[in-house]
Amino acid sequence: MSLNTLANIVPEKDTSLEKDHPLREDIRLLGRMLGDTIRELEGEPMFDLVETIRQTAVRFRREQDEEAGKELDTILNHLSHKETTAVVRAFSYFSLLSNIAEDLHHNRRRRAHLRAGSPPQDGSVTLALERVVAKGINTQQLENFFAEALISPVLTAHPTEVQRRSILDYQLKIQRLLKERDRTQLTPNELRHNEEDLRSAIQTLWQTRVLRSVRLTVQDEIENGLIYYHYTFLKQIPYIYAKIEDILERHMDKAAPCIASFLRIGSWIGGDRDGNPFVTHQIMLHAAERHSALILDYYIEEVEKIGQAMSLTERLIKVTSELEGLASTAPGLPASRIDEPYRRVFLGMHTRLIATSRYLSPHVGRQYQENTAEPYADSAEFVHDLDIVIRSLKQHQSNKLAQGAIRDLRRAVDVFGFHLASLDMRQHSKIHEQVVSELYEKNAQDNRNYPDLTRAERAEWLLAELKRSHPLVSSLSDYSDITQGELRILRMAAEIQRRFGHVALPNYIISMATGVIHILEAALLLKEAGLLQFGEAARSTVNIIPLFETIDDLRGCANVMEELFSLPEYRKMLRSRSNLQEVMLGYSDSNKDGGFVTSNWEIHKAEIELTKVFNRHGVRLRLFHGRGGTVGRGGGPSYQGILAQPPGSVNGQIRLTEQGEVIASKYTDPEIGRRNLETLVAATIESTLLDRDAIHCHTPQCYQIMEELSASAYAAYRDLVYKTPNFTQFFQESTPIREIAGLHIGSRPTSRKPSNKIEDLRTIPWVFSWSLNRTMIPGWYGFGTAVENFVQQAGNTQDVLIQMQKMYRTWPFFQTLLSNMDMVLAKSDLGIASRYAELVTDSELRQYVFTAIRTEWELCVKWLFAITGHTELLQDNPTLARSIRIRTPYIDPMNHLQVELLRRYRSGDDDDAIRRAIHLTINGVATGLRNSG
């Protein structure tokens, strides 16, 4: 074979566009090098086999060629175990390399846009600030906004993150080598060395184990989360602040003040014990210590680098008296450098930071040599020292130095402190109830058990105990393991706050909160650990955050908060939290419960009603969006998603989870990471400070249409998932759900409890499974039937369509709903899904369910096109359409292989090689899809 066709998988459309030429060249280059690696290490026959499978899969997809399907079956049926593994790995790495090329091209296009002096784009802080200034918002109002705002992506360790650290590191190396070719005029010799390095990296990838050999521990997940601080957060977050300040300065006649730190990173990794028995009090302490060790290591490195560069001599410059005083307390420098006061100051900081690290994190991180310096009491003391340096530089003609690395370090300290990230605690309300029940029964004056109490009796007892000063827990009583474990966690939380500050552990989330009782039960346990106090001196060192997850809970959450705010004791405690209450909304469980349309609509309505309740009581609202990477779990473009929130529901406050493989996709590359963070900031600024109210639908007709669509979509979804006899069997046999449980990609079990019921399955593997078999029903099912029924009942199709078309044009919520569904439909593939359906042993069940899925898919596409006016999927998003076209030739063969492997495995071939190959296909398809869980 003279032409390496694997290197020629490029976009089929728009190939004449010059802007995409570098992308095509990168894909060809990487494809050729991987093909050469396969030839060299596995032989020409293996390369030919991979190419034959790819071409046959393409024919099956694009031409719906039945003969191609049979041919593919024949090829796959006759693969040896060794061939199967090699083929899966080949397509997995083609997917990975195409992702690298695509990410690089995004950065390339953005840089070209900036070099050309083009207007700033949507999602940039530059455009967001220009828009608010143009609307008459002055700099003082902006400063006030930043002083009150909080924008916080929260990293979670949910089990769809399948890439190993080794693979991520080589991704970055390959991307760096491609950037070198792109941005540097290389000599022929340098180009040759660059290609050799690329080939070496790709060959190393081929010879690196893709899968983890053992299941991740929570400690592993903590370490995996920390790598993104090195990749992106530590450098890019200060860059964003500097950019905002520089933009504000251009709009002022004087230097812009240092704005408050509003963009911060949060984490659940090591604090989320809902359904994870491996998160203990020791693990939570380990997470806090690792966080602190990492950020202090960073400060120590930065202070050392800056100090080495600060060679300013007193013979040529003057310094302030406060800097001279600070320098006098530092350890001595060599006599040859005694005239360099800034170096003396930074040496003093360096020794104090080492002492601080040894005090806060003595057992983790780097082991520094002991010194006699006094540790910093807190990060504010370190900031104070840096401010002395900055003031001295500015007052003595060294302003440029004050605006560089020192400015970024000072901002980093303000953002990350000595704790790095705010760690959330989370536990299920049922566990709280179980612990409180035991405490009640140990202290009961009668023979009644806690579950026997009425709701009113529980509330009365809980409030009474919250106001009492003495604890319920007694050293003379024996408690169950669960109760002891929960109490140890909360006592450790108090210790972590004492060592690292309240900001290190500021939030307590109650999963499956359904009423005020669940909030009071959690409050009582927090009181037992000294984290909360009711009564005259009411206070709390944590935010108590109810998480509303099911459709019924979303519908009732505003009433719950109304009842909670009517309790004077709770309101008094809330004043110690700046009168701010956070509420978390669960996109994932509500979707599994009620489907895509109803989940989105009920969350939107809940936000509207919560905003009304909070405004009525004068309480500040912060919404925490518990979403995943896929549309079925609340994912989708962040900019459009935030702007689609109801007016008044953002108000400068937003937290949102970043989960699974999305963390790697968003934050491995620093430029892409910065752009994603900027998008959150820009959308929050615009949503809060611009008149979004004017563009939201306020007519009763819009809401009535959505109510009817939601009700119909809910019925269609529930009929399929919960009312179809043996639907669980269809799900388990037509997806790799059982095999996902054996893949070492997370520390948590895939189900909350041993059960085959859909209700007990965690949402992440539920969505992950539907993504892997390319059906993706959590992202669209029910919409088509809903519109079809609504149009039929209305009688006048044209009038109804005109109204929904207007909703699409003018209502951000409806527009985002359809846009996200459009994306999922484009990624789905019912041809491939039909092959997974063939794994279902009950032919009648298979025929019934898959016919329902296919019919609904066709209805969704039909009405999506009718409302949007489009004639093809992703018509208004050519960049994403191109991306999917690039990736599908790599993903499809892995799906076909996965079906064959599942068939073999479930037929009794339990060879380790088959099991590993199945796991490789799960990894490969997830890599290709990029947001699968």
Curated annotation (Swiss-Prot):
Q: Name one Pfam family in it.
A: PEPcase
EC primary class: lyase
Q: What superkingdom heads the lineage?
A: Bacteria
The cofactors it requires, by name, are: Mg(2+)
Q: Which GO terms describe its biological process?
A: carbon fixation; oxaloacetate metabolic process; tricarboxylic acid cycle
Does the record carry Magnesium as a key word? yes
Work out whether the entry's keyword set contains NAD. Answer: no
Question: What EC number(s) does this enzyme carry?
Answer: 4.1.1.31
> What InterPro entries does the database record attribute to this sequence?
PEP_COase (IPR021135), PEP_COase_bac/pln-type (IPR022805), PEP_COase_Lys_AS (IPR018129), PEPCASE_His_AS (IPR033129), Pyrv/PenolPyrv_kinase-like_dom (IPR015813)
Q: Where is the active site?
A: H158, K592
Instruction: Write down the chemical reaction(s) this protein catalyses.
Output: oxaloacetate + phosphate = phosphoenolpyruvate + hydrogencarbonate
Task: Name the keywords, alphabetized.
Answer: Carbon dioxide fixation, Lyase, Magnesium
Q: What are the protein's GO molecular function terms?
A: magnesium ion binding; phosphoenolpyruvate carboxylase activity
GO cellular component terms, alphabetically, are: cytosol
NCBIfam families given for it? PRK00009.1
Q: What does this protein do?
A: Forms oxaloacetate, a four-carbon dicarboxylic acid source for the tricarboxylic acid cycle.
* Family listed: Belongs to the PEPCase type 1 family.
Q: What is this protein called?
A: Phosphoenolpyruvate carboxylase
This chain's source organism reads: Nitrosomonas eutropha (strain DSM 101675 / C91 / Nm57)
